[in-house]
Amino acid sequence: KFELFRNEYKDYLENLGISAFVYPFIIKGFKFFSDDSGKLGELFKVLEIVLFRAKLINSRANIQERLNKILLDFEGDIDILKEDIKKKLNESWYWGDENTKNYLDDTNMYNFGVVNYILWRYENFLQNKGYSIQNFSIENEQIEHISPKKPDNGVIENGYDIDENKNYDDEFESEYLHCIGNLMLISGSHNASIGNKPFTDKLESYNKNPLLNQQAEIKNFSKIENGLPVWKKESIDERHQKIVNFGVETWNFDK
């Protein structure tokens, strides 16, 4: 029945990759309300939040142990389930509200396994403001550094936060380069074509190839210096905060 069920949160669970600890909750859900798609949707929404936090915060602590009693006590009341899970995760801190925000705020999101999923959900959020698109696909999906990584041979081009020697400072390298505010979903072919180009050229390519709204909105965060668009710490900070706020609100049990 799960395979045949149609629901956006079921799709989200599958996109995340369903961990073993989630299946017993799904089985119990079908036991209690196999004929109530609304209730199943509510359950999957709760489970997606738990699963996302477990994948984001890949702790050695065992989330399944903490959820076992809640699973045993679950008798079909989703509000009680949600409150019990929220309380338990906040008690254990690892997957609680505060630590979830800390991880979303991390300065090295590039190495997180869920970065594609976060940006994919962010894209859904941007697109749903205008019209509804639940599923979109990008050929050879990759993560683009808007302010580029330093090329192996050559220097960083103009329009970025570089010094007179065309280098990033230590703060930029450690806190800005790999944070979520500087990362974007892009197709592999597009990524290969823009690489280490000046920001003016990169911005033009985003606007010419607006497959994703997150590409089109970069112009809203960019600043102007000497008549040309630039992508520096201030822009990254602003976009970073917007995506972190989106994440805190999206993977929150209280919404």
Where do the protein language model's features map onto the residues?
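Betabetaalpha-Me/HNH-type nuclease active-site subdomain
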Residues: 76-215
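Residue-level marker of positions within ordered structural domains that often coincide
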Residues: 31, 52, 124, 192, ...
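Aromatic-acidic/polar surface patches that form glycan- and anion
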Residues: 19, 176, 236
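General "foldedness" signal
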Residues: 27, 40, 57, 61, ...
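Short, well-ordered alpha-helical packing segments
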Residues: 27, 44, 48, 140, ...
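A cross-family structural signal marking well-folded subdomains
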Residues: 1-120, 226
